Curated annotation (Swiss-Prot):
The gene is rpl19e. CDD domains: Ribosomal_L19e_A. Pfam families: Ribosomal_L19e, Ribosomal_L19e_C. Part of the 50S ribosomal subunit. This is Large ribosomal subunit protein eL19.
Amino acid sequence: MIIMDVSVQRRMAAEILKCGIERVWIDPTQLDRVKMAMSKDDIRALIKEGVIKKKQKKGISSARVKKLKEQRKKGRRRGPGSRRGAAGARTPPKERWMATIRALRKTLKQLRDSGKIDRKVYRKLYRMAKGGAFRSRSHLFLYMREHELLK
């Protein structure tokens, strides 16, 4: 088989198809017809017939990403060796705050209901907790002992 030079036609097709020369596909069985095409109109006619086509762009495969995601969904790859950043970086600050404030409010409510603190003290400590005065439950108890608020 003789290899025909269709570089001019390929270049014209690339211009018409708005792609690079490498992405132009020419039907190997119709090379003689393509060789005869001299004008852009001839090339357009061949494109319409399907003799000349535009190859699809090469993409980036997401198969590996999907596989990793599936494994993480199962709980794999989450051990200490895979973790980057401090513990605080992995749990958002808002979630940490929510956990702390819920524990403090639950504790305060229990103390008020059991009569260990009165309503006034409860309200004062509740407001302080909201303002971020206590780091934890133990810090709250320390404050109450220091200020003799427990009955």
